[in-house]
């Protein structure tokens, strides 16, 4: 059964949190697909993952490039799983995939300081639970550490 994780961002921006989660994904030997909602976010995230630290980068590509299926991390606007990912990250209100059960994990990241994002995440939580999936809810504390809330 797919494990669905909700990440309530409060004290760190997405640009700080997502690379860490993606690094852990690659350490497990998994492929990831990251679904965004705008071309601008796709381009910004593509640039950021190459340069987020001076010491390393995350190997990735977008579904607009050749060889999307070969990418360990694929950034997309679509609901497709072109790289055969084990985990799907949904950012900034990306819709739940119709094929949730085809993933080991589904991670939903949202800005807890944005009222609309919070309301959308609550709707997604209800839909996940009504679909019979296990879900956990993680919220950042003041130091940016994750605390399980549900």
Report the location of each language-model feature.
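Short, solvent-exposed amphipathic alpha-helical segments in soluble enzyme
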Residues: 21-24, 48-52, 106, 123-127
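Terminal and domain-boundary regions
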Residues: 28, 45-49, 53-54, 131-134
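Glycine-rich, aromatic-bearing surface loops/beta-hairpins
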Residues: 104-150
